[in-house]
Regions:
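Acidic/His-rich, divalent-metal-binding segments that scaffold phosphate/diphosphate chemistry
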Residues: 1-52, 56, 62
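Composition- and surface-driven signal marking solvent-exposed, interaction-prone regions
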Residues: 9-14, 43-52, 68-73, 86-87, ...
Length: 193
């Protein structure tokens, strides 16, 4: 279960929800098994070598092409979310848009996020921290909004509906400012009670 058991610190709960929602966990498990296999070939980029070795192995055992592509992609990209979340400006929308282009599905993004978590948390006790988790989660959310087709236009359509549902209880300006500070998905999924 990737160390995401029942008694979980609050900073890991979002990752647990991602894991629980995966449609094909076995693809993540294969990526976890294969992600560092390219290290056996010294002197080369282990992510690229690992992708090639993974593709060859998974084709040989007869997995469907779609699955082979997903797992090979995860192996190739297994360092990218860690690198981007810790070394790039997550407020750079162009960078997020460019990063999002490589994902065919939201499922591939979810699996890459979980692979990144597992890879970092499995290295040493100090490789993972709540801060790194927050950065990784922020990158995931911003990228998922692009991959899933969420954009400013959708947020602009969702916010008035939420404001209308809350206008009796909370001033419009307060609700709007709060919703615009949250991920776009929040305004689309949460309704006033």
């Amino acid at each position: 279960d990737l160390g995401l058991g029942a008694s979980l610190p609050s900073d890991l709960r979002p990752f647990k929800r991602l894991y629980d929602d995966l449609a094909r966990r076995e693809l993540l498990y294969l990526a976890l098994l294969m992600h560092d296999v390219g290290k056996a070939r010294r002197g080369k980029d282990h992510s690229v070598e690992g992708e090639n070795m993974t593709r060859t192995f998974l084709e040989r055992i007869g997995l469907p092409t779609k699955w082979v592509e997903s797992v090979a992609f995860l192996v190739r990209q297994h360092l990218s979310m860690s690198h981007i979340s810790q070394r790039r400006d997550l407020g750079d929308e162009e960078m997020i848009q460019e990063f999002a282009k490589q994902f065919r599905t939201g499922e591939d993004l979810r699996m890459l996020c979980l692979l990144t978590y597992a890879d970092l948390s499995g290295v040493t006790n100090t490789a993972w921290s709540a801060w790194k988790g927050q950065l990784l989660w922020e990158l995931f959310i911003k990228t998922f909004q692009v991959v899933s087709g969420s954009d400013q236009e959708e947020q602009d359509l969702a916010i008035p509906q939420v404001i209308g549902e809350l206008e009796d209880r909370i001033p419009k300006d307060t609700v709007e400012a709060h919703l615009r500070s949250l991920p776009i998905r929040y305004a689309q999924t949460v309704r006033g009670n």
